[in-house]
Amino acid sequence: MLRRETSTIYRTHKKSNSSILRSQRDQTRVDSLVEESPMGDFGINNQPTQPGVIYYFVELTNLGIQENTSSNNNNNNNHGDDENGSRYGHGSSLGGDVHSRRCS
C-alpha cells in the first residue's frame, strides 16, 4: 500500500520503467539555539562510560629473601607487638608496602 505522500508523487509523476518513486518525508529541523540546564551543562557527549583503572604500586622495603619459608614464619612470629604490627602479617617484615592510585 502506498503512503499518502508517495501517492501524490505517483499521480503527478510520469510513468516510465526507469523512474524511482521517492516519498517526501518531513525533515525535523534542529533549533540552532542549544538549551542548557539551569545548573550548567557539564556533560560529555559521545564518550563511552568506562570504569576507572586502579593501578597498584608495590614498594619493596625488605629485600632480604630467605630460602626457607618456615624460618621466615618463625622470624615474623618472634617480633614484638610494637614493630608496626608485623606479628599479624601487615607490617614491613612482609617485604613491601602496597600503595593504590586511581587513574581515570
UniProtKB/Swiss-Prot annotation:
Residues 1-48, 66-104 are annotated as: Disordered. GO terms for biological process: cellular response to stress; cellular response to water deprivation; stress-induced homeostatically regulated protein degradation pathway. GO terms for cellular component: cytoplasm. GO terms for molecular function: ubiquitin-protein transferase regulator activity. Present with 149 molecules/cell in log phase SD medium. This is Uncharacterized protein YJL144W. It comes from Saccharomyces cerevisiae (strain ATCC 204508 / S288c).
